[in-house]
Structures are given as C-alpha cells and as structure tokens.
Amino acid sequence: MQLKRVAEAKLPTPWGDFLMVGFEELATGHDHVALVYGDISEHTPVLARVHSECLTGDALFSLRCDCGFQLEAALTQIAEEGRGILLYHRQEGRNIGLLNKIRAYALQDQGYDTVEANHQLGFAADERDFTLCADMFKLLGVNEVRLLTNNPKKVEILTEAGINIVERVPLIVGRNPNNEHYLDTKAEKMGHLLNK
C-alpha cells in the first residue's frame, strides 16, 4: 500500500453532499482526495472517476482541455446514480507539475502538440502513476468499478493493480475550437477513445 487514509469530512457541493476523504502518500507526503457519494458499501460495481488534477481546467475554466468539463460531468453522473466515487488524483499536468504545464502550453502556442511539448521538456507523454488510485479504491473498500474514462491505459493499469473494471463509461464532453487539436492528439497519439 502506497497511501494511508488520514482525514475525512462532509463536503457540500452543488451536486449534493459528498464525503471528502484525504489520503497521504507514504513515500512523499503528497496528498490526494476521494469524493464519495452515497453508500458505496453495497456489493455492486461503483460508478467512479479517476480525475487527475488540472488547475487550469478545473478551477480557472480553461478551454484548452476538457478536464473541467469532465469533472463537472462526472460529479453530475455520480449524483444522478445516487452513489459513486471521484478520485482527485493530484498529479497536475499528467504529472509534470503546474510550471512545466505552463511551459508546455507556451510550446503548444508555438505549434507543438501536447505530446511533442512534453517531449520537448524532457517528459513522457504521460507521467501519471494510476497505481496510487488502485490503493485509494482498496482503502475505500471498493474492488469493482464502472469507470468514467476515455483512457484505455487507465483501465489497463487499474486492472493490473487489482481493481475489477466491469465497464468503461465514456465521458466525452467539452470539445470546442480551443481544444480540438489537443483532443485529436490524445486520440491519435495516446489512444484515448474520443468520438468527434
């Protein structure tokens, strides 16, 4: 286990009241959060989203990505379902960090795509570690998930880490003129399952 569960509190939101559960990485002290809605203790698969931190999309309403749109759509779907989990995976910019993400944006403004920009900065296309999320699910007592994602790699890694993904639920929202090239690149170079 790479994490420990350290704190929890009620979090009222526009979608209803969630239980916010805080986790701490044992090796680094980095924190991550789960938002739990309703009773997840039933022995049926739980609707869940692994959402990687995106300050620009989630909090600053950037149209360069689909992250903020996905966050809102996932919370809406979880609330409508009556139970579910959103794991807020604190690995900003596919885990290159906020400042490098800004540098990558500058390279994209010069014509590089999102993958090329990461490579120009010395990073892989995706530096995230989703095994941490498998540990969060396990600490929440969840083993079977209906995963809200367009990323087949996320499904593969969580499955290899012991989480039974019984269904991949598409989450295709937020396409606009500012992020079309970004989304097309994610589909073409990173294998994301995105329909235009």
Swiss-Prot record:
Active site: D126 (proton acceptor), R128 (nucleophile)
Pfam families linked to this entry: GTP_cyclohydro2
Pathway(s) annotated for this protein in UniProt: Cofactor biosynthesis; riboflavin biosynthesis; 5-amino-6-(D-ribitylamino)uracil from GTP: step 1/4
SUPFAM superfamilies assigned: RibA-like (SSF142695)
Cofactor note: Binds 1 zinc ion per subunit.
PANTHER family: 3,4-DIHYDROXY-2-BUTANONE 4-PHOSPHATE SYNTHASE (PTHR21327:SF18), GTP CYCLOHYDROLASE II-RELATED (PTHR21327)
Subunit structure: Homodimer.
Role summary: Catalyzes the conversion of GTP to 2,5-diamino-6-ribosylamino-4(3H)-pyrimidinone 5'-phosphate (DARP), formate and pyrophosphate.
Name of protein: GTP cyclohydrolase-2
Organism annotation: Shigella boydii serotype 18 (strain CDC 3083-94 / BS512)
